[in-house]
Amino acid sequence: MRFGLDLSQHQLTWDEMVSRAHLAEEAGLDGVWAFDHFTALYGDPGGPSLEAWTLLAGLARETSRVRLGTMVTGMTHRHPAVLAAEVVTVDHLSGGRAECAIGAAWNEEEHRELGIPFPPVAERMDRLEEGVQVLRRLFTEDDVTFEGRHVRLEHATYRPRPVQQPHPPIWVGGTGRRRTLPIAGRHADVWHGWADDAMELAAMNAIIDGAAEEAGRDPAQILRASSLSISEPWDEVRSAFDWMAGERIGYLMIEWPSEGRARLEEFLEQVLPTLG
C-alpha cells in the first residue's frame, strides 16, 4: 500500500503548504495532493485558495522525493492541451514526479461565480473521455490531430516530452457507474474513488474490470486508489484500511484531519506502521 497526503490548501498560506509537504516527505509518504478549485471549498468562500498547478510547481522545488498531483483536475477547468503543458512543466520542475489526475468537474456554483461554462453531465463526461485521450497523445506523440465532439486539435505538438516515460500516470477520479468507471477502465492508469463498504467497492471494481477487458486491457494494470479519513477512532481507521485493502485498493490518500497536525502526526507515528 502506498500513501499520499491531501494538502487541503483552502484558507491556508504558502508557508503552511511547504510545511505540510515537508511533513509528508519526512514521513516517507508517496505523494502530496492539492485540490484543483479556484475558490475555497471550506470555511470562508472568499478566503485564500492557492491555484493547484502553480502550487505544485512551487512545491516541486521545495521537495525532492514526494510525488505531486491534484485530486482532481476537472476537465472543464482547462483545455486538455493547456493541462498537458502544465503537467509536463511540473514533471520537469520535479525531476519526474508529476501525477495527472482528472475528473468531470462537479462544483456548479464555482463555475457560475467565475463564468466558467458548466455543461450538462453527459457533455462533461464526454469531455472527460476526450480529454484523457488528448492528454495521453500529447504526452507521447507529435503532430496530433484529434476530432472529438468537444475537443479538437490540428497537428498539435507539445515539447518538451515528460521526464517520465512514456508519460506521467493518468488518474481518473469519480464513482459514476454509467460513465466514469467505464472511462477509467478504458483509459486510466489509476482510478480514484470511494465507497461505504467492501461490497460497494467490489461492485465498482467489477465495472472497471469489465470495461478494461472490453478495451483489450489487463484490469490488473489499473491501480485502484481511495481516501482514508483519520478523524475516526483508530480501530475504525484500521477497519476501513482492511476492507479497502481487501478490495484491491493499492493507494490511499490520507485526508488532512479537522483535528489538525497533531492528529496526523499521531497517525503517522503510531497507526500507520501497524497497517497492512
Which role does the model predict for each range below?
Residues 1-276:
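Active-site-adjacent structural elements that line small-molecule/cofactor binding pockets in enzymes
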